[in-house]
Amino acid sequence: MIINISNKEDFQTLLKSEKPILLDFYADWCGPCKALLPIVEKLADKHKDDFAIAKINVDNNGELAQEFGVRSIPALFFLKDGKIQ
C-alpha cells in the first residue's frame, strides 16, 4: 500500500512506524514521476510486509522537500529508524 503524505503531521506519524520507509517525492506535473509510478506500485505490492512506501507531493509539502534537500524530482529516500540509509 502506498501512503500519501498530506502534511508534516502525517509524516511524523509515519516515522513512528517500526517498518522502514521508502519516501517518493514527486509532483503531479512531473513526467519522470509519472513514469516511475508503476515501478513504485509494484514495489508496494511485492514488499508490503517489508517496508512502507510514502508519496510526498513537493508542491503541497515544500517544507518536507526542503528538509530532505530535494532539488529535483522524482527523489527517493529510504529511511530506517527515522534515518536515511
Spans of model-derived segments:
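Proteins that catalyze or organize thiol-disulfide redox chemistry
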Residues: M1-A52, D59-Q85
